[in-house]
Amino acid sequence: MLASTVTGALQEQGRAKVNLTLRVVGRRADGYHDLESVVAFADCADQLTLAPSPELTLTTTGPLADACGDTSDNLVLKAARLLAEAVPGLTLGAFTLEKVLPVAAGIGGGSADAAAALRLLARLNGLSLDDPRLQAVALKTGADVPVCVPSRACTMTGVGENLQPLALPVLPCVMINPRVPVATKDVFQALGLKPGDLLVGVSDVLAAPAWPKAGASIGDWVAALDQVKNDLEPPALKVQPIIGTVLDALRASNGVLLARMSGSGATCFAIYGGDADAKIAGAAIAAAHPEWWVHAGTLS
C-alpha cells in the first residue's frame, strides 16, 4: 500500500503472480478448467494510481504501456465497473497504470492490476477486502483476480476461488519472459480437454500433496514442489517452442534448484539457494539474451 505524490491520490502495486505448481484436474461441463496451484508473488510489479475525478478513466504509462493496447476493455476498468454495479454509490476516479510487467505472459499482470484497482476502490470507499461483493467481483473479473487481491502465497483450487494461505519462505528467483505473448486460450486448446474430461485420476485427486509448514527451508520447499509439475508446460511448448529455450537457459545456470514455466507461459522462473546465485544467474542470462525480459529477485 503506497501513497502518491498526486494530491488526494492513492497507489497500489500489481505484483507478478507466479504458479510454482499448476495441476489441471479436468474440464468442467461449463467449459472452465478446475485447477490446483501453489501461487507466490514476485517483488516486481506494475504501479496503479487512483486520483480523484468525476469520470472513470485509465491512462497507461511505463516501458510496456504500448503492450496494453486499447484500454477500453482493460481489466482495471472491468473490475471498477463491476464493483460500481455491485456497490451503489461507489466513488470512482482516474486510474494511471505504470506498466512494467510483460502481458500475456503467465504471470497474471492484468489480473494483478485489476486486483490493485479493487484494493484502491476499497480504500477510497471504506470497503473491506473480505466484502462478499468485492470477492464476487474479483472472480467475475477473471479467474486469477481473487488470488491477486491479497497477493500472498497460497494454494489455489477450483477455477481460482478457493484460497488457502501457505507459510512460504522468501525464495530467491530469476524470472524470464522471451517477449513473446502466449494466449491462455491457445494453451488450453492445445491441452485438448473436452467438457467433462479429467486429466488426473481419482487417486491423484485424493493424494493431494502436504505442503511444508512454517519454518521449512528453501530445500524442503523445492523438494515438495518438484513432486508436482505444471500441466500446461507441454501444450505451451507446442504453442510457443521458445519456452523450451528459456527453460534450458535457466536449468543450465549455476546454483539453480528448480526451473519451470509459470501459468500458461511464456514466463519461466528458477529458484536458487541464495540471493547471490539468483543475481549472478540473472545477469548472465540477460547478457546472453538482451532481447529477453529478465528479473532477478524474490518470490514470497
Swiss-Prot record:
Keywords: ATP-binding, Isoprene biosynthesis, Kinase, Nucleotide-binding, Transferase. The keyword Calcium does not apply. ATP binds at P102, V103, A104, A105, G106, I107, G108, G109, G110, S111, A112. GO terms for biological process: isopentenyl diphosphate biosynthetic process, methylerythritol 4-phosphate pathway; terpenoid biosynthetic process. Its EC number is 2.7.1.148. It comes from the Bacteria. The active site is at K17, D144. GO terms for molecular function: 4-(cytidine 5'-diphospho)-2-C-methyl-D-erythritol kinase activity; ATP binding. HAMAP family: IspE. Catalyzes the phosphorylation of the position 2 hydroxy group of 4-diphosphocytidyl-2C-methyl-D-erythritol. Belongs to the GHMP kinase family. IspE subfamily. This is 4-diphosphocytidyl-2-C-methyl-D-erythritol kinase. It comes from Bradyrhizobium sp. (strain ORS 278).
